[in-house]
Amino acid sequence: MKIYPDLKQVQELAEKHKANKIPIYGVIPADMLTPSVAYLKLNQGKKYSFILESVTQGESVSRYSFIGSPYRILMANGKTDPLARLERELKEVKTAPVEGLPSFSGGAVGYVSYDCIKYFEPTTEMPLEDTLGLPEAMFFMTDDLVAFDHAYQTVKIISHVCIQQGRPIEEAYEAAVFKINMLKKKLESPEIPLPEQKKVHLGYEAKSNVGEDGYKAFVSNLKEHIFNGDIFQAVPSQRIARRTDLHPFNLYRHLRTVNPSPYMFYIHCDDFDIIGASPELLVKSEHGRIINHPIAGTVPRGKTKEEDEAYAKDLLASVKDRAEHVMLVDLARNDVSRVCDLDTTSVDKLMTIEKFSHVQHLVSQVSGVLRPDKTRFDAFRSIFPAGTVSGSPKVRAIQLVYGLEKEKRGIYAGAVGRWGYEDDNMDTCIAIRTMVYKDGTVYLQAGGGIVFDSDEQDEYVETLNKLRSNVTAIEETEKLYAEEENSSA
């Protein structure tokens, strides 16, 4: 297998860019591999690992799947801004551009919980029950990863030449080549170490933390605040907990087929797992441009093409949904313009329909060119959490919803994504349609935007619609494994 770039080219890149980490890679065909199989082969027995995918049509969105594990883990302790440490770590790396690599070839993969807003807006901090007990943020620092190029049906095996004073660059290059060859050997092994799946029982009941009456009370309370002029909009949520005998990776494998989404992810964090199919980009940094995708307004998918189109037309004609959406686009413009040049901030797309497996949404795009005195982390802090999961004005809405929910949201409505070694490389989604698996229980959470004319029953049903795709994935996966057990008995 040929390695790109070669040693001489790496030496030239290191000198030209004053780099201390340079990516190199080899390429193998992907015709006998899938991302799920590659993940299993590469991460057997590892306590921490990840797979990031985009299972949608369109090369610009879904070209690559990324698989890897960390060489070091950054875990938030609940005392200081977790992004500050991540920013310091990434700044220590000076890399160089290498042709032929995907947009992400090394850096950090992880999550930022919704409750980290207290570090960016201290007035939102208040005592809250910590039901799940997860770290506030976690980042996997990764130099070695596998990128599936779905456009060309190849696999790029990536490692980094770590250049250190006193260490010959030839030695560092050979160490990186050795890692690539070890990964190649694992990928080409005929053995697929399937997850250990115990006997699956059906019929476990899902339990809400607030119930139907509790959620409707949230809506009524927030409508009073809207009527009194305290806020324009807010986003309460409910969390459901459900036992399951499924291995969490088996659940992810099925989820990616029944709910293909722009942001698919499975992150294994030792004693808990994050399984997601998010439709919504939070913030992306691309060639100096900051991009945000507000999603607000939801209707179900129809059983027929005609019914599907009727639902979409109703959504586009809904005065309530359009008003709410415009409000959140304005909030997104404000968040983006705080870190971007005002004359470059624009609404690139306004209120288009995007269809997913179980729901349809109104979607817009807001973007701007990052100011020279700002960084991608400033952009993240400005936009986080998204107005679509918090409200408007954002800080007051967060305070009011926290006062009702009285629990930490954890990963729900936070962010999952990747931050490259390059200064302008960041791609994060909102952690919605996301499940947390811990100790044999799956936790799911969903909310909806409340405005002055919201109907309590409609809003409650909307949360159920948003939960449905993941609940269905759990139920269908359980049935599949139960049927396999019965047929082999």
Curated annotation (Swiss-Prot):
Residues where Mg(2+) binds: 324, 462
Record note on quaternary structure: Tetramer of two components I and two components II.
Reaction(s) catalysed by this chain's protein: chorismate + L-glutamine = anthranilate + pyruvate + L-glutamate + H(+)
Textual note on the cofactor: Binds 1 Mg(2+) ion per subunit.
The protein's annotated pathway: Amino-acid biosynthesis; L-tryptophan biosynthesis; L-tryptophan from chorismate: step 1/5
Family: Belongs to the anthranilate synthase component I family.
Stated name of the protein: Probable anthranilate synthase component 1
Pfam family, any one: Chorismate_bind
Something else known: Component I catalyzes the formation of anthranilate using ammonia rather than glutamine, whereas component II provides glutamine amidotransferase activity.
Annotated binding of L-tryptophan, by residue: 54, 262-264
Modified residues (Phosphoserine): 390, 392, 488
GO cellular component: anthranilate synthase complex; cytosol; nucleus
